[in-house]
Amino acid sequence: MIDILNLTYDELEAWMTGTLGEPRFRARQVWQWLWQKNARSFDAMTNVSKATRARLAEAARITWPEVRTVKTSSDGTVKFLLALADGALVETVLIPSESREGKVRMTQCLSCQVGCAMGCTFCSTGSMGFERNMTMAEILGQVLVAREHLGDDRPDHPIVRNLVFMGMGEPLLNLNEVMRSLRTLNDEFGLCFSPRRITVSTCGIEKGLRELGESGLAFLAVSLHAPNQEVRARIMPRAARWTLDDLMAALESYPLKTRERITFEYLLLGGVNDSIDHARELVRLVSRTKAKLNLIVYNPAEGLPYEAPSQARILAFEQYLWSKNVTAIIRKSKGQDIKAACGQLKASELAELAGMAVTEEPKKEAE
């Protein structure tokens, strides 16, 4: 029995016409039920004949991640602990913002692996180690769960507006499933997210970088976090196997759309990478390409030997970058009180949570 959410549209159409003997238009109907109408069962597909629904139910299943816990931060950030079909546990986060019209909008942070192989020394997920890659169905299942939780069931996504592959895992080490996910996200009859609303963040993996760029399916963000090879090798030992010089050389030829820039994420670690000398090196580095910088203040994580810089050092770092015509924005941290902020996603407590019943706080109304 196949997991039907794991099929791209072309695969679904080929399977339904070939294996089930259905006309092509049936595949389009089923596809829209799966991705636009949040159908959890074939019985819900009311414009599909009963006979076809019965054949579908005999040959396929619709498997969503199981919600184990839902935690809501004082700032409105929502963190889901999800169990996959084999019992593996992952997290996804909804980060709120307010539109110019005063309406609540959400950015969803997606995981793409169970654990992470990169082992970055400042990241809680990195301390978990790597278990396995997630499938397309598991990656996009996070979106389905969040949309259902928020009542966001319209194709124009009035609530969940942006998606960022910045959760657990390194996307370019799960390139095949991430690319399949991006195509389904972009499909106008699927989840229907514009590429301009999707960002894929990578530590800088040579394999896959060019393919992602040429696809045009998402914006690129690079987890840089260091202005030189020595610091990067110390805090990101596995990512540093590909040197900063090689990374920047690849990014110099990365295909960008008009007015598009590469976002560099830079985590400010007190006494490690936050001096003016570091800022000076950083300017020289990122000036090699069209760039903007997201400055992220370190979020404390249990067992990790780092601290946030002082506010004075943070502002001095930012001001130096601006003085050299480098766009730099200090990203406001959200969800710290529920361990949902950058670098805090971790399934270390997941074994004890595995048997926990669903815990969900009252939903907040979104305008």
UniProtKB/Swiss-Prot annotation:
Matching Pfam families: Radical_SAM, RlmN_N
CDD domains given in the database record: Radical_SAM
Main subcellular location: cytoplasm
Cofactor requirement: [4Fe-4S] cluster
Domain Radical SAM core as annotated: residue spans: 102-337
SUPFAM superfamilies documented for this protein: Radical SAM enzymes
Enzyme Commission number, as recorded: 2.1.1.192
Highest taxon, organism lineage: Bacteria
Compartments it resides in: Cytoplasm
HAMAP family assigned to the protein according to its UniProt record, in alphabetical order: RNA_methyltr_RlmN (MF_01849)
Family the entry assigns: Belongs to the radical SAM superfamily. RlmN family.
GO cellular component assignments: cytoplasm
EC primary class: transferase
Keywords: 4Fe-4S, Cytoplasm, Disulfide bond, Iron, Iron-sulfur, Metal-binding, Methyltransferase, rRNA processing, S-adenosyl-L-methionine, Transferase, tRNA processing
Residues engaged in binding S-adenosyl-L-methionine: G169, E170, S201, S223, L224, H225, N299
Catalytic reactions on record: adenosine(2503) in 23S rRNA + 2 reduced [2Fe-2S]-[ferredoxin] + 2 S-adenosyl-L-methionine = 2-methyladenosine(2503) in 23S rRNA + 5'-deoxyadenosine + L-methionine + 2 oxidized [2Fe-2S]-[ferredoxin] + S-adenosyl-L-homocysteine; adenosine(37) in tRNA + 2 reduced [2Fe-2S]-[ferredoxin] + 2 S-adenosyl-L-methionine = 2-methyladenosine(37) in tRNA + 5'-deoxyadenosine + L-methionine + 2 oxidized [2Fe-2S]-[ferredoxin] + S-adenosyl-L-homocysteine
NCBIfam families assigned to the protein according to its UniProt record, in alphabetical order: rRNA_mod_RlmN
Described purpose of this protein according to its UniProt entry: Specifically methylates position 2 of adenine 2503 in 23S rRNA and position 2 of adenine 37 in tRNAs. m2A2503 modification seems to play a crucial role in the proofreading step occurring at the peptidyl transferase center and thus would serve to optimize ribosomal fidelity.
GO MF annotations, alphabetized: 4 iron, 4 sulfur cluster binding; metal ion binding; rRNA (adenine(2503)-C2-)-methyltransferase activity; rRNA binding; tRNA (adenine(37)-C2)-methyltransferase activity; tRNA binding
Gene name of the encoded protein: rlmN
Disulfide bonds: C109-C342
Name recorded for this polypeptide: Dual-specificity RNA methyltransferase RlmN
Cited InterPro entries: Aldolase_TIM, Methyltransferase_A, RlmN_N, RNA_MTrfase_RlmN, rRNA_lsu_MTrfase_RlmN/Cfr, rSAM
UniProt remark on cofactor binding: Binds 1 [4Fe-4S] cluster. The cluster is coordinated with 3 cysteines and an exchangeable S-adenosyl-L-methionine.
Binding positions ([4Fe-4S] cluster): C116, C120, C123
Note: Reaction proceeds by a ping-pong mechanism involving intermediate methylation of a conserved cysteine residue.
